[in-house]
Amino acid sequence: MSLGVLAAAIAVGLGALGAGIGNGLIVSRTIEGIARQPELRPVLQTTMFIGVALVEALPIIGVVFSFIYLGR
């Protein structure tokens, strides 16, 4: 196993770990906000989905960079 494959696996794994933690924090804070002010649910959910999408973009970019690196 080459070091390039190991580096790509670590990059993808850490990206997924960070995204999982970030998504958990985003969703938990959104639920807390909805519990405090239920009338703001639509606004908070919209903001949550945008935040989750931005956080999920990072592991996808990591996978793409790993494939590009391994393709060389």
From Swiss-Prot:
Query: What residue intervals traverse the membrane?
Result: 1-21, 48-68
**UniProt modified residues of type N-formylmethionine:** 1
Principal location: membrane
GO terms of molecular function: lipid binding; proton-transporting ATP synthase activity, rotational mechanism
> What HAMAP family does its record include?
ATP_synth_c_bact
Q: What gene is this protein a product of?
A: atpE
* Domain of life of the native organism: Bacteria
Membrane topology field: Multi-pass membrane protein
Q: Where is this site: Reversibly protonated during proton transport?
A: 56
Q: What is this protein called?
A: ATP synthase subunit c
Q: Which GO terms describe its cellular component?
A: plasma membrane; proton-transporting ATP synthase complex; proton-transporting two-sector ATPase complex, proton-transporting domain
Organism, by scientific name, is Bacillus sp. (strain PS3)
Location relative to the cell: Cell membrane
The record's family statement is: Belongs to the ATPase C chain family.
Keywords, ordered alphabetically? ATP synthesis, Cell membrane, CF(0), Formylation, Hydrogen ion transport, Ion transport, Lipid-binding, Membrane, Transmembrane, Transmembrane helix, Transport
The record ties this protein, via PROSITE patterns, to: ATPASE_C
